[in-house]
Amino acid sequence: MRTKLSTCNVWFPLLVLLVWNPARLVLANIQEDEAKNNITIFTRILDRLLDGYDNRLRPGLGDSITEVFTNIYVTSFGPVSDTDMEYTIDVFFRQKWKDERLKFKGPMNILRLNNSMASKIWTPDTFFHNGKKSVAHNMTMPNKLLRIQDDGTLLYTMRLTVQAECPMHLEDFPMDAHSCPLKFGSYAYTTSEVTYIWTYNPSDSVQVAPDGSRLNQYDLLGQSIGKETIKSSTGEYTVMTAHFHLKRKIGYFVIQTYLPCIMTVILSQVSFWLNRESVPARTVFGVTTVLTMTTLSISARNSLPKVAYATAMDWFIAVCYAFVFSALIEFATVNYFTKRGWAWDGKSVVNDKKKEKGSVMIQNNAYAVAVANYAPNLSKDPVLSTISKSATTPEPNKKPENKPAEAKKTFNSVSKIDRMSRIVFPVLFGTFNLVYWATYLNREPVLGVSP
């Protein structure tokens, strides 16, 4: 018995291997045959779909309007150019429509195809109305996707990079907000032939990737969608519009423009505290601050398009320029009255000297006339001549000469204009800043959105 059991234990695994290996080979062959059959079925379905198919004709020609459902997924938004008034956007652009000619029956419900099939069927002639430049990505192969359902519904997706126009109104710059549109529609088909419809609700038809913002100077507040019809000489066309709402960040401009302007105005007001006789110092303050404001105003305009109206920053710079220039005019006024005071002291001293010289000359002339009149009589009368000699011998007592008063080098007191300016200028400039920032920072952004 033991011998028989050991013999069975040896032969049983061999029998299992002999039976399993052929079965496994048969299953593999069956699966391979099924794969070949599927490939053959796919090929036959595609050949049958394209047999007699004319991609020059739209679906439902002569019977119904072709409805194209669209949605957009934004992978990258930005940058935005203020000078060119344009922005760059990278999207997955998706379109879905139904073509009865592409219905099929088979073991699968969806045919997943690449871009080679897209060139053999009809696709919408969609273009971007406000696009300056559009690029379809082709590395390493054209980035296109095509799916055909058994009921003839097609999904066509492509990756695009679009440079589009973004009209900007810069009256509130740099506290401004903008709505950049992306408009697209059919180039050749009117509303009676092809119409566009958003696939989902407004919040889902246009989506932006969480890390898709490429903006340094803006915040992307959100997006909205719309639809409109435009008329032209060739008919009416459907235009789909997606608006991207942007709010400018003010931090860069505060550091680069606003703070330097404020510091320049404060520096110009330091001259009110200098002595009004310090002409060189106050002149340097005034001229330097005026030139600095001129440079700041020029540099602030370099980052903006050449618009014909004044922006909020222009108004701020203009007021700062007015304060700086007024400080220079204030010094000129103070200096003018200071010069008149010094000139008056000098004239009074000169006039006193002239009066003293005139009185001395008058006394000398009177004495000379008296001597000339009595000279002949003295020579005839010996008594008078003796008296005259005795009278002329002693020298008259000289009166001590009064030294002319020297010009007093007095220092002018603080000008009343300077005293007033020390209070008026800072108060006015502070009030202006309060009104300016309260007005623009609390203003709701106005976004121009077309219907």
Curated annotation (Swiss-Prot):
Glycans are attached at residues 38, 114, 138. Keywords: Cell membrane, Cell projection, Chloride, Chloride channel, Cytoplasmic vesicle, Disulfide bond, Glycoprotein, Ion channel, Ion transport, Ligand-gated ion channel, Membrane, Postsynaptic cell membrane, Receptor, Signal, Synapse, Transmembrane, Transmembrane helix, Transport. Glycosylated. PROSITE patterns: NEUROTR_ION_CHANNEL. Residues 396-408 have a biased composition (Basic and acidic residues). Disulfide bonds join 166-180. CDD domains: LGIC_TM_GABAAR_alpha (cd19052). It comes from the Eukaryota. Pfam families: Neur_chan_LBD, Neur_chan_memb. This is Gamma-aminobutyric acid receptor subunit alpha-2. It comes from Rattus norvegicus. The gene is Gabra2.
